[in-house]
Amino acid sequence: MGRIIGIDLGTTNSCVSIMEGNTTRVIENSEGARTTPSIVAYQEDGEILVGASAKRQAVTNPKNTLYAVKRLIGRKFTEKEVQKDIDLMPYKIVAAENGDAWIEVRGTKLSAQQVSADILRKMKKTAEDYLGEPVTEAVITVPAYFNDAQRQATKDAGRIAGLDVKRIINEPTAAALAFGLDKQEKGDRKIAVYDLGGGTFDVSIIEIADVDGEKQFEVLSTNGDTFLGGEDFDQRIIDYIISEFKKEQGVDLSKDVLALQRLKEAAEKAKIELSNSAATDINLPYITADASGPRHLSIKLTRAKLESLVDELIERTIAPCRMAIKDAGVSVSDIHDVILVGGMTRMPKVQEMVKEFFGKDPRKDVNPDEAVAVGAAIQGQVLTGERKDVLLLDVTPLSLGIETLGGVMTKMITKNTTIPTKFAQTFSTADDNQPAVTIKVFQGEREMASGNKLLGEFNLEGIPPAARGVPQIEVSFDIDANGILHVGAKDKGTGKENKITIKANSGLSEEEIQQMIKDAELNAADDKRKLELVQVRNQAEAAVHSVTKNLAEHGDKLDAGEKDAIAAAVKALEEALKGEDKAAIADKTTALMAASQKLGEKMYAESQAAQAAQGAAAGAGNAGGAGGASDASGKPAGDDNVVDAEVKEVKKG
């Protein structure tokens, strides 16, 4: 097994980490940053930009620049959270044939998995550039409160990116691993991980125990909201700016896609600035224009105003904290440490509310942007077998069950059950001579199945005729270490059985995944071709510049035929540069270098002759004799202006 990288696939930013021995290393991307914006832009010429380069061009290409796509992964188009995003996002969210929420870009429908795969591919390449070897395996993190469909979709995104996802791990659990591994405190410690990221919120209560020299991380409970995060905070600021601008100037910016993209950038910047200062100015010249001319936006935003705008959002994080404490069977006073994860936890008001609830200051020795990726890398090392002193016991965040008579949700596995786990229960038919049963699998906490999320359904057919209640049908649930569910149904009388991995009514089919992998490989090949073309083009342009300059300066040393040959080769290469044929450009560059060889030889000979002449002149000056007497030092007698000295460099201050 090779190196397993740890990837934090975030809503706003992503991060990649590896283990070097027992030390974790967060890897800088090609721009030198330790985190990469989770933004993907699709250019007109087919080029795909990921990260900072995509973010930079977002203002001029808002409809084809995708951000916060993690909020759509594994979701149905009809879900209320998705419907809410449709009105807010500059890009077009559409319904796929299977009912999932997809995105339309330049007339092509893309799944959230494909877009996420572009981000994962960038993280994969970041690791490969650092390690100098191919990377094929990863541990990817997800919010603890992600349901089965969202976990499966994240795994599929990894496959499309060319990664074998060895484990899906919960973000708060990963952060706890990063925090707890180097702590020397003895005895059991209970920690709360409060994770408020760009698009999701999680809280987990985790017990770290020392068991015979092994660190055991046991998740006692988890709770959260997969549609609450920094993006919502940004939106509150954007809405405020729009309403203030409308009051002052009578212009509504809410339907101006270009203006909205600039407002998004400004809101994010203002939010970050207000974590360190009491007020900030938002200045956006030429934000829009009407018949009277251009309009400029200038608004002062104070920290107090920001806090009043987002107070209700921060308040929404407290109910899950309360529930997590209750489900863990502990009290707030039992919590030893509170760890903050996610960029939003830098906001003073968030820290204040967390302190108020838990009754203690949160720890400051955890990097909120990097801890999750670091924890994923640690888990990767555990999976390779290199690390044997860590045991991770995670839980399923939501109850799982099936629909039974009357539409009731019969729970098979309750929330916060340690995984992996198995459970089986026997059911029977509802009607006489019923030939088949449909098993509908749901996830959620509501008493009626219709109030929960339908994960999938399948049939068990060929049940022999019998009175209702007689057939014995065993339904088994099996959750693997990734939190992904496998369900089976077996007729005990006939031995007939049927099994599925839950992904039937949602997500991508195997054919779609394979097609997307092929598309990604084609894109990678295309990217390689483009890079090679750019490199050849750069060499050619440098050759044209160099030869043209040398010809102008030293062309008089050549005869007319040689000059004409070089000029013709330059012209041929310039023509080739107008096209996209890499081989033609390379050939013409080689031809130009061959044609200009004579020029190079003449320049070299001229340079050698000049150096020889210089040496001869210097020798004559030092020879003494008829040219004038000199003393023993070689200094002409009576010349007081010539001084013997050691030469040393003097640095200018």
Curated annotation (Swiss-Prot):
Output the SUPFAM superfamilies linked to this UniProt entry: Actin-like ATPase domain, Heat shock protein 70kD (HSP70), C-terminal subdomain, Heat shock protein 70kD (HSP70), peptide-binding domain
Kindly list the positions at which Phosphothreonine occurs in this protein: 200
Q: Which UniProt keywords apply?
A: ATP-binding, Chaperone, Nucleotide-binding, Phosphoprotein, Stress response
Query: Do you know what upregulates this one?
Result: By stress conditions e.g. heat shock.
Enumerate composition-biased segments (Low complexity).
607-620, 629-640
What GO molecular function annotation could you give as one example from this UniProt entry? ATP binding
Q: Where is this region: Disordered?
A: 607-653
Task: Enumerate the NCBIfam families for this protein.
Answer: PRK00290.1, PRK05183.1, prok_dnaK
Q: What does this protein do?
A: Acts as a chaperone.
Report the HAMAP family cross-referenced here. DnaK
Hey, which family's this protein in?
A: Belongs to the heat shock protein 70 family.
Q: What is this protein called?
A: Chaperone protein DnaK
Which source organism?
Verminephrobacter eiseniae (strain EF01-2)
Q: Which gene encodes it?
A: dnaK
